[in-house]
Each structure stands twice: as C-alpha cells, then as structure tokens.
Amino acid sequence: MQGVVGVYSGDNAIQKALNNLYGVQHRGQESAGMTAAGGNSMRTWKGKGLVSNVCRDLFRSFMHPDDYVVIGCASGENADKIALPPLEYESDRFKFSLALDGHVQNRGSRLNEEVVGSLIMEKLRGGTGIEVAIRETMRELPNAYFSMVAALLDKDERRSELVAVRDAHGVRPLYLAMNEDELFVASESAPIDVMESMGQGIEQRQDIAPGSLVRRSDEGLTERKLVEPQHAHCAFEWVYFGRPDSVMEGRNVHSVRKRLGQALVETHSLRAAYGGPRKDVVVIPIPDSGRSVCVGVAEALGVTADEGVIKNAYLGRTYIIDDPEFRRIASDLKHNTIRDTVRGKKVIITDDSIVRGTVSESVAKNLIKVGAEEVDYLVSYAPIYYPCFSDPPDKHLAAAPYEGCSLAEIGELVAHSLPSIKEVRYNSPENVIDAIGLPRERLCTYCITGENPLVKTRAPEITMHDSSPED
C-alpha cells in the first residue's frame, strides 16, 4: 500500500505537497519521496524512512521558483533504495515521474511503478500522447489496479503538468480539490481537509471517478474518462486502511466503523450478556482502527469505552512479518496494557480483523496477566478466507480453514486456537457491505467472499482522438 499526493500550484507547491504527504503517512512507512518539475527541469529525492526523515529538510535544497508541479509518495513496499518510488523516465522530449498506490499482478520483483512507468514511456517515445499512452497501458494490464500521480515535463515546450489517474475499478481511493489556479490530489480526503483548515482556498472537491484522468498545466484543467468505470472499491479501505477522518465515495470512515460496531452487537445479541450500565465490563480498542468500532459497540451496549491497549507508534505493522517468533516479539513490543482500565473486569476488545491471530493472542494474554477476568474479541470485518491480490498466495489466515462454517462456528474455532481469548465474534460480509452503504456490486470483497471483480470483464475503452504527443 502507498499514499500518494500531487500538487499544481504557483504558490509554494513543494511545501503544500509535503504537508499533504504527512497526511497520507499512515498508508506507507517504508520509504518516502517527492518529484518537483518546472521550467525545463525535474528533480526527485527519496529515501528509506518516514516523510519527516526523508523529505522535511532535503526538499528545501531542491526548491525552485518555476516548480509548479510536485508529486510525492509514502510507500509501504520494502524495496531497494535505488528503486524506491517515485520513478523517473526520460525520452528525447519528455521527462516523466510517477508514484502509484495499487498492484500489478505477475510483476515479479519489479515495483508497480516500474511496470506501469516503462509501458507509458514506451508509448510516449513512440509519439503517443499522454492520455492515449495511459489508456493503452491500462488496456495492457487489465487485472492491475492503481491510483497514480505523475509529473510530466515537455522539454520542447518547457511545460510541466500534473497528471492523476484512477483505474476502472477504483480499488484504491484518489481524491482531488481545486480552485481557479491550483489542483491538489491525494489518496484520501483528510489531508485536503487539513489544508483547507490552514487557510487554503478550495472551490471544488470530489473523488476522482474510476477510469478517469485529470491533468493540470498552465493551459488549464482537463478531465477525461479513459475507460468505462467498473466500480470495485476495496471494502478494507473503510475497515482498516483509511484515516477515520477521511471520506471515501461519500462515506466517512469513522461512521462506517461505528456502524460495524453496532452491527456486531445486533448480530450476536450481545446486550443480553453485556448490556449496561455495568461497572464490571469495559470495551477497549486495538489502536488505531479499532477505536471507532469501540465507540459503536459501547454506545449500543450502554457500557464504558476506555483505552486499555497502547500502541508504540514507532513500530510498523506486525502482520506482514513472516517469521512467527519475530512476529510475536514485535507484537509484544508494540502493545502495552493499562492495568487500571482492565483489572477485575470483563474486557471486550474491538479490532478491525484477525489475520494470523498473533497480535490478538499477544494482547489478550497480556490483559489476563494484568488482571482482566476474561477477554472477548469483537472483529469488525468478516472472516478473511483469501489473501488479497497484493499478498503472498500462501499467507496464513486464521479463519481460512473454516470457510463454509457459520459465523458462530468460525468464532468458536478461531477462539479455540487463541487460548487467552474466551470468544471471538465476527461481522458477516452482509454487515460489512451494509455499514459501508454502497451496493455490493460496487465493492471488492474478495478476501471475505472469494468474488474477484478484477477478472470478470475488461473495461470497455473510450474512443479517443490522438492528434499529437500533447493530447
């Protein structure tokens, strides 16, 4: 996963891009980078680490008054320093730098940007315009999905432009905001909100439609539909990936997670067992994505919600670690408990998912150690049976062996494999879809249903006129 941003502005574009890049840091912590373009130059700087380590100080030495276009990314992919995004490509006439959030299947050890960027540049070198080059690349990669930002420099015309593209399925989010003179693009709406609260003028804001391209240069703004949309928005964006203050496809992430918590209470008739007011029951979240779910559960039950597990924000995601022992140690280091919150109480934990079960068991075991009477685990997502397209196919999933069982049976079987947890309760796929509030056919729920929207059909093309390389 990756957070991407793009800015077209004649007023300190680099600083504005950097501010927005901080706002998508949660989408990737392995590396960061930025590309600035203007006049007849393009410069990229990148490195391993967080945005604050890589970009905060270095960018000042790259600033140039002609820089109208800046893109940036915070990447979660572990790659060699040389191959970190954004990646630059060059022909006799064009320079092109891109960063994308998504996945290209069968790419081997190459970055997503290497596959997409090389195809686009190959077409630019052949005299194809940028819009047709991107459309043809999307056609050649029918099962890929990506939200892309790019800086394009035409050396002959001494003109730079910002390009933003979202694939036909819209699996990953991409948001834009603009005024008469500026265009801002980001993976999520939250950094745009922050920018506006700091005094940035915004006249229009919206999701970039699936299958669409947006361009901004000194010649103005262009919006184009490249292929017909075939909506398949990743349901896990609302459950885990997205910031709670972001709005995706018109649905606020925090509100969706609250509804998921309320659905758990209704589905499993939890009021009879835990309904308040009771002083011996407390609902605590696994930070951060469990917090909004915790609010929904506590409100529905009428019991206290509190903080009982504290996360070390400087340790990365533990579920991506393959070695079980290293994963357990990392989880123990990442989470600590607040004794006063849980001692002598029945603890209800809210979490977005149980992937392997390592974190769940580690946290529950520590809660019991410090005095919790029992630990029940409420999972806002449905049981995960299939690894995402971007995950290794042999990834261990706690619920995978129990596909076909009822929700109650799956909860019992998973709880049996986690000795410190008394009960595990999941939402159903239907609950997840209802909480998001989009039609089922507009969501990708492959990991919980096995329905793969990316291989049903190829997106129909839009007829386009390609009269010059500038098109």
Question: What does each of the following model-derived ranges do?
Answer:
Residues M1-I208, R215-V281, I286:
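Conserved short alpha-helical segments that host acidic/polar catalytic motifs at enzyme active sites
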Residues I14, N78, N106, V171-R172, ...:
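Flexible loop/turn segments at secondary-structure boundaries
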Residues A99, A151, V165, A177, ...:
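Generic beta-strand/beta-sheet core signal
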Residues E114-L119, T304-G316, S417-I436:
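A conserved beta-strand->alpha-helix junction
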Residues G126, L270-K279, A300-D306, D340-R343, ...:
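Secondary-structure transition/capping motifs at alpha-helix termini
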Residues R159, P173, R205, V227, ...:
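PRPP-dependent phosphoribosyltransferase catalytic core
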Residues Q200-E203, G211, Q262, E266-H268, ...:
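Phosphate/diphosphate-binding loops
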Residues E299-V347, G357-E361, Y385-K395:
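Short, glycine/charge-rich flexible loops or terminal/linker lids adjacent to PRPP-binding catalytic cores
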